């Protein structure tokens, strides 16, 4: 039995998120403006068949595939939304399920820290080498989701809504983690947009 944990369609990858994803991509790199689909399933090995189905169904490119024992995730992208949606539908048909049967998103952590200190900023920057750096004095938005893949959707919608800097968007493992920084007003707006986006997702209860 394959469980659909995450199924998230991104209509247009924002510049920072696309670049961040490209730093970790082992496949074909996404570019800003691409449509993208992030799928996470359990058990992890099931993702191989789903990648095969998607790539044979349309012109999508496979940006990333991560296979763990418990969970497997895949990211496909293409400039044309219809190609991405067609590949996604073929996967759903194979699983004999619907998009809305994905697992419910639970926000495990959601907080804004204002006026980050120099010591704190340095430690965060040393720990993270894929995104941008946080500067002392900036405000920081941190979020954690379960399943992990939903954090990508939150990051994309937050970047659409405000002039913020993406520090981290980790969507692998049991929990997804997002870190963004910027001016206090911008961070407040980004946090609002991220939370509202996740609330709009229709999932099984």
Curated annotation (Swiss-Prot):
Positions of the BMC circularly permuted domain: 3-100, 106-205
Keyword Metal-binding: no
SMART domains associated with the record: BMC (SM00877)
The entry's keywords: Bacterial microcompartment, Carbon dioxide fixation, Carboxysome, Repeat
SUPFAM superfamilies in UniProt: CcmK-like
Main location: other
One of the Pfam families matching this protein, by short name: BMC
Gene Ontology annotations for the cellular component aspect, listed alphabetically: carboxysome
Keyword Repeat: yes
Sequence motif Gates the pore, location on chain: 68-69
Compartments reported by the entry: Carboxysome
InterPro entries referenced in this protein's UniProt entry, alphabetically: BMC_CP, BMC_dom, CcmK-like_sf
GO biological process: carbon fixation
Function: Part of the carboxysome shell, a polyhedral inclusion where RuBisCO (ribulose bisphosphate carboxylase, cbbL-cbbS) is sequestered. It may control transport of RuBisCO reactants in and out of the carboxysome.
Family: Belongs to the EutL/PduB family.
Domain notes: Contains 2 BMC domains, trimerizes in a staggered manner to give a hexamer; each subunit in one trimer interacts with 2 subunits in the facing trimer. Each stacked hexamer can form a pore of about 14 Angstroms in diameter. Dimerization of the trimers forms a channel-like compartment, accessible via an open pore. This channel may be large enough to accomodate transport of substrates into and out of the carboxysome.
Quaternary structure and interacting proteins, as annotated: Homotrimer. Forms a dimer of stacked trimers, the same faces interact. Probably forms a CsoS1-CsoS1D-CsoS2 complex.
Name the record gives this protein: Carboxysome shell protein CsoS1D
Protein's gene: csoS1D
